[in-house]
Amino acid sequence: MRKAGLWGLLCVFFVSEVKAAIVLEEERYDLVEGQTLTVKCPFNIMKYANSQKAWQRLPDGKEPLTLVVTQRPFTRPSEVHMGKFTLKHDPSEAMLQVQMTDLQVTDSGLYRCVIYHPPNDPVVLFHPVRLVVTKGSSDVFTPVIIPITRLTERPILITTKYSPSDTTTTRSLPKPTAVVSSPGLGVTIINGTDADSVSTSSVTISVICGLLSKSLVFIILFIVTKRTFG
């Protein structure tokens, strides 16, 4: 009896040590806020085809929190939605797919797929999932726009009021006109708008006529003086 009792204790101790030694390696997912987590958890179709599955969160130092579970019948493909969580159960493919949408920083933590049959302990189907959610980059490139102002020439306008009708007339400022007069030569040169109408030939003829008239006067005076003193 004592030997049987000792062997039983040794077996229990050995099994507990083996269970403690089997620690599933975590699978890490690094995502940004607003993205979607997708995890595929395979299971043994011979053992768990007709079993209820669940997606759980493992808070530090607390009991596992069951977020969403599959619904009957378990032998047919089904899809369950619970808030941001979705379970897609496909027994023919021996696959449980989990989706978490619109991730936030507060969703960071440890999760797992399990065979859910309370009050018995859940059976872990896949590696625990370590989810790390970070905020996205808020840096947005804003182009700098520098306005360029070009100076344009505009005509000068003069506004004149005429009474009594108080009508307003707008006209362009005329170009300045300069008048150069030569009394001796009898030539008048107009510079400005009127000067454009005077041709070069008319000016030349006027100058020649003036020189001839002066020459004739000089000759007449010379003849008169000679006769007087002759």
Curated annotation (Swiss-Prot):
<feature type="topological domain" description="Extracellular">
    <location>
        <begin position="21"/>
        <end position="202"/>
    </location>
</feature>
<keyword id="KW-0732">Signal</keyword>
<dbReference type="InterPro" id="IPR007110">
    <property type="entry name" value="Ig-like_dom"/>
</dbReference>
<keyword id="KW-0393">Immunoglobulin domain</keyword>
<dbReference type="InterPro" id="IPR003599">
    <property type="entry name" value="Ig_sub"/>
</dbReference>
<feature type="domain" description="Ig-like V-type">
    <location>
        <begin position="21"/>
        <end position="124"/>
    </location>
</feature>
<feature type="glycosylation site" description="N-linked (GlcNAc...) asparagine">
    <location>
        <position position="191"/>
    </location>
</feature>
<keyword id="KW-0675">Receptor</keyword>
<dbReference type="GO" id="GO:1990266">
    <property type="term" value="P:neutrophil migration"/>
</dbReference>
<dbReference type="GO" id="GO:0045087">
    <property type="term" value="P:innate immune response"/>
</dbReference>
<dbReference type="GO" id="GO:0070945">
    <property type="term" value="P:neutrophil-mediated killing of gram-negative bacterium"/>
</dbReference>
<dbReference type="GO" id="GO:0072672">
    <property type="term" value="P:neutrophil extravasation"/>
</dbReference>
<dbReference type="Pfam" id="PF07686">
    <property type="entry name" value="V-set"/>
</dbReference>
<dbReference type="InterPro" id="IPR013106">
    <property type="entry name" value="Ig_V-set"/>
</dbReference>
<keyword id="KW-1003">Cell membrane</keyword>
<dbReference type="GO" id="GO:0030593">
    <property type="term" value="P:neutrophil chemotaxis"/>
</dbReference>
<keyword id="KW-0391">Immunity</keyword>
<keyword id="KW-1133">Transmembrane helix</keyword>
<comment type="subunit">
    <text>Monomer. Homomultimer; when activated. Interacts with TYROBP/DAP12. Interacts with TLR4.</text>
</comment>
<dbReference type="GO" id="GO:0005886">
    <property type="term" value="C:plasma membrane"/>
</dbReference>
<keyword id="KW-1064">Adaptive immunity</keyword>
<dbReference type="InterPro" id="IPR013783">
    <property type="entry name" value="Ig-like_fold"/>
</dbReference>
<feature type="transmembrane region" description="Helical">
    <location>
        <begin position="203"/>
        <end position="223"/>
    </location>
</feature>
<keyword id="KW-0325">Glycoprotein</keyword>
<feature type="topological domain" description="Cytoplasmic">
    <location>
        <begin position="224"/>
        <end position="230"/>
    </location>
</feature>
<feature type="disulfide bond">
    <location>
        <begin position="41"/>
        <end position="113"/>
    </location>
</feature>
<protein>
    <recommendedName>
        <fullName>Triggering receptor expressed on myeloid cells 1</fullName>
    </recommendedName>
</protein>
<dbReference type="GO" id="GO:0002250">
    <property type="term" value="P:adaptive immune response"/>
</dbReference>
<keyword id="KW-0812">Transmembrane</keyword>
<keyword id="KW-1015">Disulfide bond</keyword>
<keyword id="KW-0472">Membrane</keyword>
<keyword id="KW-0399">Innate immunity</keyword>
<dbReference type="InterPro" id="IPR036179">
    <property type="entry name" value="Ig-like_dom_sf"/>
</dbReference>
<feature type="signal peptide">
    <location>
        <begin position="1"/>
        <end position="20"/>
    </location>
</feature>
<comment type="function">
    <text>Cell surface receptor that plays important roles in innate and adaptive immunity by amplifying inflammatory responses. Upon activation by various ligands such as PGLYRP1, HMGB1 or HSP70, multimerizes and forms a complex with transmembrane adapter TYROBP/DAP12. In turn, initiates a SYK-mediated cascade of tyrosine phosphorylation, activating multiple downstream mediators such as BTK, MAPK1, MAPK3 or phospholipase C-gamma.</text>
</comment>
